[in-house]
Amino acid sequence: ALTEIENRSLGEAYFTRGWAHFLMAYRYGTDKQGVPFVRYEDFVNGYDNSIPPQQASVIDNYKLIIEDMENAKKRLPRFEDYDDKDLGRAHQAAAIAFQVKVYAYWAMWDETKWDEVIKLVDELETTYNRGLADTFDELFSSDFSKYWGKEYLWTIPGTGGSTGGGSEFPGVILENKGWGIYNGWGQIKPTYD
């Protein structure tokens, strides 16, 4: 039997895998060709580092992503059950919200999936108290406590301390010199000097 933290961690793993595969599937998949999808639980004797199988259709990808989000939902707590230090972690409503997004993309190939979208949005509103903010001010308030309101679904919160310009180490800014103030790659041509 899994401990509570192991169960939640497994739920987060399912959530993250589904999310990552969705990012590839909707960009590169079509009704005639899906994208590779690795399900480690399908490797009975362990992962053998072979090339992951490509799905026959993006619809097959969407089915696997929905399955991952279902598995995540079963293992994740509700948003309301998190302490302040855990806000930003995946939770049940976030898994359902991603299912909504997947079904909306799936509806491009099968219009009957809009019914699933409506059903799941209704579940988000009624069972999980997600919905639109009561006032416009709640969306753009400087009071950060309002950030976790009923419109909140899921984010990866920052830890602060950044200058807002992205990573300070591998960044490439178009500056025509070597390692300068902007850490650009530039043209860096050798000379006889």
Language model features with spans:
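Aromatic-anchored glycine-rich loop motif in surface-exposed flexible loops
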Residues: 1-87, 106
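An aromatic- and glycine-enriched ligand-binding surface/loop that stacks and positions planar moieties
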Residues: 33-35, 62, 69-73, 89-193
